[in-house]
């Protein structure tokens, strides 16, 4: 799975500021669901975002608010994001964003 080059740069900067991400990048996380490929952390098969990632809002906006998405409801927005990304509180963030 690939991501936009600008998003990738931002993701790597965010990883460098997050203790868990730094540990995952050097192989110190024992949970077998996490893996690193080309400096990107994956949880299962989704790109892992840190707790304070600024990419969350960009992803929510791109998935729910873009003209091509037609303001999908919660379920479609959640599923679309969950296919590619993983972060703690994803479901709650999607619910909040869809309600706004």
Where in the sequence are the language-model features?
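Amphipathic alpha-helical
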Residues: 77-100
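A general alpha-helix detector
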Residues: 59-62, 76-80
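Flexible, low-complexity interdomain linkers flanking nucleic-acid-processing modules
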Residues: 1-68
């Amino acid at each position: 799975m690939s991501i936009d080059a600008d998003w990738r740069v931002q993701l790597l900067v965010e990883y460098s500021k997050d203790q868990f991400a730094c540990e995952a990048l050097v192989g110190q996380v024992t949970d077998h669901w996490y893996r690193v490929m080309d400096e990107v952390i994956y949880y299962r098969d989704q790109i892992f975002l840190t707790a304070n990632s600024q990419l969350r809002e960009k992803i929510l906006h791109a998935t729910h608010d873009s003209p091509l998405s037609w303001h999908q409801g919660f379920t479609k927005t959640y599923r679309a994001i969950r296919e590619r990304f993983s972060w703690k509180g994803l479901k709650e963030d999607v619910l909040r964003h869809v309600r706004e």
